[in-house]
Amino acid sequence: MVRGLRLKGSSVERVLRCNVLQSPLAGVSDKIFRALVRRWAPDALLFTEMVNATSLELGHGRGKVEELSEETGPIGVQLFDHRPEAMADAARRAEDAGAFLIDINMGCPVRKIARKGGGSGLIRDPDLACRIVESVASAVGVPVTVKTRLGW
């Protein structure tokens, strides 16, 4: 049961008031899907689909982040990339849009993402993974979490 779970960021503490969490699902957890989940679990922690920090920087993934302000309830934004600066910038944008927390994707095994050093590809470079976590955590006040896997 996660009811009342406290998540601390550098300047913001968040409290989950529901035992329902909807994980980020590429191609599934869009705004419409989240609205359906929210109908049955109003206080659930929902997530966006994973957002490529570089695409967001170039203006291609803005909709996934900017639409947060139109929604109610806690929504986490899952980011992936291999560049600490891009991840920090994307995290700031997500926080400004109202993200409840930022989740760093270090678990996606999709080849085109992992071979560029994103997703589970970060497991192969622990120093880079640490730099990304540090840059994101220092860029935002909301809690930062990491989705990972046990091995590659």
Whereabouts are the PLM-identified features?
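Glycine-rich, positively charged N-terminal anion/phosphate-binding segment
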Residues: 3-9, 25-100
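Glycine-rich, proline-tolerant flexible connector loops at the mouths of alpha/beta enzymes
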Residues: 50-57, 106-126
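Short beta-strand segments
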Residues: 49, 78-79, 105-107, 149
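Active-site gating/metal-coordination segments in enzymes
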Residues: 98, 102, 112-113
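Alpha-helix-loop-beta-strand connector modules within alpha/beta enzyme cores
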Residues: 66-76, 119-146
